[in-house]
Amino acid sequence: MTISSQEFALFEAWENNREDFVYDGVVSEADYLESKTKLCFVLKEVNDIGGGGWDLRNFIKEGARSQTWDNIARWVACLRDIESNINWSELETIDNEYRKKQLRSICAFNLKKSPGGHTTERASFDAVVAEDREYIQKQYDIYNADITVCCGTGWDLREILDLNHSEVFETSRGIQWFLNKQNKPVFIYSHPAARVHTPLLVYGLIDAIREVCQ
């Protein structure tokens, strides 16, 4: 089965149990599978107080928006050329076309499929994720990602994957990570829109992945 057909079958069952369902996952299956390194970004929930019923994959395919997705595009650009040191001057200015180009090859999904507001209400998030645990496990397994980046969701995904007792490693600069059940690295990192000086947020992740994966 293709990735898209597996997503469709999973979401068909899942959306019956979750109001205002927002679809997500692999943006372009061909680009994802052709990638030397399959990248998966795990987020909490979409910010849409108006309600769901739309597809994050299409939103990303059209370039998404600068908040959140500029930094993910920067991460992807650096990871696709990890042996090089891309200067900040090459990353500082991001436009819609750049995001479209960089984001086509990724997988991006939210643990909570119903939308929330600007900030996550932890109690609501925890309750929904607990109810949808098996669905989330199945979705993650579809992608067989080489590198997973948890964008403020690392400890949540670790629990969902029943890896609470697995070892958590730390890079020389203090970035934590663990291995999933396929022995692929999962990085516990900040949300891409975190209030951190942007170059530090961008290069902090790249340095960690370079240390672990090269």
Q: Residue spans of the language-model regions?
A:
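Surface-exposed cleft-lining segments at the edges of enzyme active sites
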Residues: 54-63, 78, 112-129
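Proline-aspartate-enriched helix->loop->beta-strand connector
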Residues: 136-153
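Short, contiguous, well-structured surface segments enriched in hydrophobic/aromatic residues
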Residues: 99-112
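C-terminal capping/extension of enzyme domains
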Residues: 2-12, 122-137, 156-214
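Short, solvent-exposed loop/turn segments at secondary-structure junctions
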Residues: 45-49, 112-116, 153-157, 191-195
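Ligand-binding pocket scaffold of soluble enzyme catalytic domains
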Residues: 22, 31-34, 85-95, 100, ...
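Active-site and ligand/interface coordination hotspots across diverse enzymes
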Residues: 1-80, 135, 139, 175-182, ...
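Short mixed-charge
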Residues: 79-102, 166-181
